[in-house]
């Protein structure tokens, strides 16, 4: 194992000198044993001349001094994989952070891997039920597909991801991997305790590199989580779920690292390699003939601007998008999904069937008509509308409220029991509202209920 010496430390960037001809390869992991015995991992990023490499640290560089000895491992960062990581919480380099002793994983995978070969990819399209009405009806997720949850600050991305983990892990009993990338540590802590209580933890591996970590860890932790998921797909031939919260922080960390390495910034100050980095990550999240990785990624939208380069680059890779809207959150409708802005590639009668497709289209039409009429209502009031339009508005408002739903993970906030709504129940409910079967019920009956039967029961109490 070749040894080098630290020559310079600038925040999370560390320069290391090696003897001539012994430079580590790009992306190789280097390790430093600190004076207190703890291990710090660096990742090689640049070669500066014949004898020096520039590296990025995966943890805080506090307490490092020039001249400390650095060992070259000769390979990229290795993540522990397999059944041993289920029920455990790891950091970016695969060390446990849950205080429950060492991880007993026999195999490791490099966090930098090539995407599956073109001929190994699977192309079949099938829907994947989440139990959330607005998603299953209007932007169905595909098994083995990639879904993005877009939203500004505080509109409910993390709550929606936690609900999806809860529903899918309970209903489908598959393995899940959760990568927490640059988000709040408190939310990770909540997720951990909730999973412990619900018993879902035994089928889930959690990997965290949160807001307080240096950019190196935040830029790599998504890859660690992905490697764990790839093992289950490729070696155990399973269908795995990969949750990433938040993919924007992956880009943000990449931008910090890029600036620290002295690269010229590109549009809006992002790194010039933005599209490449995103592509390398997203291309590995895919389904092969062996198994599938279905991913749900929360994507923070800076200043609610969907044209910002970070969310715009992520858009290109996704099969379905769920856009969370502040206007809908302000109406008190949760999940605050914008039914007209969200899309899905499999919203196609050949995949989901005519009944589902026609219902989804009629819901979108009635909501779009209501949106068009809102300007007239704001200026002239409801009385100026034709009888036909008044009926459209009344039904659209019921549809809008029926798109809300009480969540299991939000029971503490809403005081209502969570609901898992089967797809056929969703379709039936929306068809009946649009057909006018429930024109006699008040709007409030449709707010925060599961099935249409619950709305009818609720109407009796109003």
Swiss-Prot record:
Its EC number is 7.1.2.2. Pfam families: ATP-synt_ab (PF00006), ATP-synt_ab_N (PF02874), ATP-synt_VA_C (PF22919). It catalyses: ATP + H2O + 4 H(+)(in) = ADP + phosphate + 5 H(+)(out). It is a peripheral membrane protein. Disulfide bonds: none annotated. CDD domains: ATP-synt_F1_beta_C, ATP-synt_F1_beta_N, F1-ATPase_beta_CD. Its main location: membrane. GO terms for cellular component: plasma membrane; proton-transporting ATP synthase complex. Keywords: ATP synthesis, ATP-binding, Cell inner membrane, Cell membrane, CF(1), Hydrogen ion transport, Ion transport, Membrane, Nucleotide-binding, Translocase, Transport. It is an enzyme of class 7 (translocase). ATP binds at residues 151-158. GO terms for molecular function: ATP binding; ATP hydrolysis activity; proton-transporting ATP synthase activity, rotational mechanism. It is found in: Cell inner membrane. F-type ATPases have 2 components, CF(1) - the catalytic core - and CF(0) - the membrane proton channel. CF(1) has five subunits: alpha(3), beta(3), gamma(1), delta(1), epsilon(1). CF(0) has four main subunits: a(1), b(1), b'(1) and c(9-12). Belongs to the ATPase alpha/beta chains family. Produces ATP from ADP in the presence of a proton gradient across the membrane. The catalytic sites are hosted primarily by the beta subunits. This is ATP synthase subunit beta 1. It comes from Chlorobium luteolum (strain DSM 273 / BCRC 81028 / 2530).
